[in-house]
């Protein structure tokens, strides 16, 4: 596989035919792609039931959801590169939910306090030829022990809302992290090195206007 250093330099302005479609409504993934010079031509999130199956393990679950997103959206965009991702926070074999309310976020933070957890990032790409390519990445994160006051103060904001595991490492929760092993961007929402390499390896080249 080739890695994405072909984006460097002013002379490389061509792109293989076909647009890039992001099968996600996550603003974090849009921002992360922008960091490496990738701007989707379209954003078309998949509407899926993302409930884990009984006894489904975290990594296979993340891979299944990313794959399902890409395959659901690809038929709507023939001739495009369709990129999908899924991020899962796991403590042991347990998949932590996306926190949609403060009670859920509090439960997640209490579970993560003083402990190590995994963040699994799965990406799936459907090429213009209809080929499905998948990758998954695991980052290890260790939180310091959180006091009740620290948790309450964090929950008083809203950056936890909608986040897997009830926290956003790119925000105030960065102060909770004792150490991190692996991809930081994966913990934010998309493993950029692997995403860039996957796209470059299939012939995608970002276009540039002007």
UniProtKB/Swiss-Prot annotation:
Q: Quote the InterPro entries the UniProt record gives.
A: ITPase-like_fam, Maf-like
Using the UniProt record, give the first listed, main subcellular location: cytoplasm
Main function: Nucleoside triphosphate pyrophosphatase that hydrolyzes dTTP and UTP. May have a dual role in cell division arrest and in preventing the incorporation of modified nucleotides into cellular nucleic acids.
One GO biological process term: nucleotide metabolic process
**Cofactor(s) this protein requires:** a divalent metal cation
Q: What name does UniProt use for this protein?
A: dTTP/UTP pyrophosphatase
Q: Where is this region: Disordered?
A: 1-22
Catalytic site positions: 86 (proton acceptor)
| Similarity field | Belongs to the Maf family. YhdE subfamily.
One GO cellular component this record assigns the protein to is: cytoplasm
| Annotated catalysed reactions | dTTP + H2O = dTMP + diphosphate + H(+); UTP + H2O = UMP + diphosphate + H(+)
Amino acid composition bias (Basic and acidic residues), ranges on this chain = 1-15
UniProt keyword list: Cytoplasm, Hydrolase, Nucleotide metabolism
Q: Which Pfam families match?
A: Maf
Q: Which Gene Ontology MF annotations are present?
A: dTTP diphosphatase activity; UTP diphosphatase activity
Query: Location of site Important for substrate specificity?
Result: 28, 87, 170
State its location(s).
Cytoplasm
* Protein EC: 3.6.1.9
Top-rank taxon of the source lineage equals Bacteria
Q: Which organism is it from?
A: Rhodospirillum rubrum (strain ATCC 11170 / ATH 1.1.1 / DSM 467 / LMG 4362 / NCIMB 8255 / S1)
């Amino acid at each position: 596989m080739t890695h994405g250093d072909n984006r460097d330099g002013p002379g490389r302005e061509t792109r293989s035919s076909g647009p890039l479609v992001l099968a996600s409504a996550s603003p974090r993934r849009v921002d992360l792609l922008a960091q490496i010079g990738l701007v989707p031509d379209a954003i078309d999130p998949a509407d899926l039931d993302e409930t884990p199956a009984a006894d489904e393990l975290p990594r296979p679950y993340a891979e299944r959801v990313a794959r399902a997103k890409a395959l659901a959206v690809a038929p709507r965009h023939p001739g495009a590169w369709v990129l999908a991702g899924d991020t899962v926070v796991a403590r042991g074999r347990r998949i932590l939910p996306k926190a949609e309310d403060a009670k859920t976020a509090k439960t997640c933070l209490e579970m993560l306090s003083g402990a190590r957890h995994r963040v699994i990032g799965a990406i799936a790409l459907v090429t213009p030829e209809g080929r499905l390519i998948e990758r998954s990445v695991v980052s290890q994160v260790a939180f310091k022990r959180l006091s009740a006051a620290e948790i309450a103060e964090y929950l008083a904001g809203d950056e936890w809302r909608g986040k897997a595991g009830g926290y956003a490492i790119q925000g105030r929760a960065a102060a909770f992290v004792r150490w991190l092993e692996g991809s930081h961007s994966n913990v934010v929402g998309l493993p950029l090195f692997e995403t860039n390499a996957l796209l470059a390896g299939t012939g995608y080249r970002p276009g540039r206007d002007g």
